[in-house]
Amino acid sequence: MPKLYVYGTDRQKTTKLTIAFARGVIRHNNATNGPWQVKHLPITNYLEIGFPSDLVAGQDAVATLGVLRGTGLMLKSAKAKGIDYYYMDHAYFMPGYGGKGWMRISKNSHTCTTLREVSKDKWNGFHKNYGYQCEKWKNNNQRGRDILVLPPTGAVSWFFDQGKEEWLDQTISELKSLLPESEHYRIKIRRKPKEPVVDAQGNLIELKTYPGSHSDIPFETQLLDALVVIAYNSMAALQATMQGIPVITSENSCCYRVSFNLDVYKNQHDPQEFDTEPPNRPHLLYLSLIHISEPTRPI
């Protein structure tokens, strides 16, 4: 019987969610979904002794929530050892830990990137009632001029084994090489307010703020002046594309399947490609319907 070790988070509220996940697996154990031998452990157990000696790669699995305070360290180790892992985090629609909501769960991936066809009528149900709308696609004349760049947080950069500013530096450098110097003023960098900064072990050091920066401006306000949003994996990219703004993301973004590419800036300052709506944009609704998302090959 395969084993599933579910680790807590060292925080009471989110540990309760990992316990609920473990209990859910036990409740639904059957020939199709398992059966799993499930055990819940505190994350300190992994930090002190590592994985249990009876954990077998290719057969058993681990699960946890988030990447801070040891959970990310555990997930990175699982990936390196070829151990399947289930990752939980905020949902893409109705995120948060309070009220009636849900969590996103992905297998062997930090992000849900699977999209499947979903009827547009679904937007008239739950999502419309909770304020979510898939707005009409805007053409270049209906959008602003800013190129809004959203770098990954320190915690995300650490989890993906990147230098703190590696993605940002590469993105800005490529943008400036594609645009004439007279257009560089359009590039606006927006960092996550209260950005989590971690040490080499993934432990939270601080929630960093950037007074006087573009981060102080409400994101909704910045979108009014944006031609495009370029993001590593920020959930703000989902908000942008739902409002008819094109996005350019990394493969670690939930919007990767509707993402444009920086190459569209070759020989043009306002890419005409942005006028065309990604045909699968309405299918982003699928991100709220799936139970387990597995990574798929790029289309």
Per-region residue spans from a language model:
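Conserved catalytic-core segment of nucleotide-activated headgroup transferases in glycan assembly
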Residues: 142-200
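A nucleotide-sugar donor-handling region in carbohydrate enzymes
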Residues: 88-161
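Single conserved hydrophobic/aromatic residue that forms the stacking wall/gate
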Residues: 290-299
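Extended catalytic core of nucleotide-activated donor transferases of GT-like folds
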Residues: 37-100
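Catalytic phosphate/metal-binding cores of nucleic-acid and nucleotide-processing enzymes, i.e., regions
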Residues: 131-146, 203-206, 210-219, 235, ...
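N-terminal pre-catalytic "stem/leader" segment of glycosyltransferase-like enzymes
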Residues: 1-61, 155-156
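Structural loop-to-beta junction motif characteristic of Rossmann-like glycosyltransferase folds
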Residues: 83, 228, 244-248
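Donor nucleotide-activated moiety binding/catalytic core segment of transferases
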Residues: 49-55, 70, 190-243
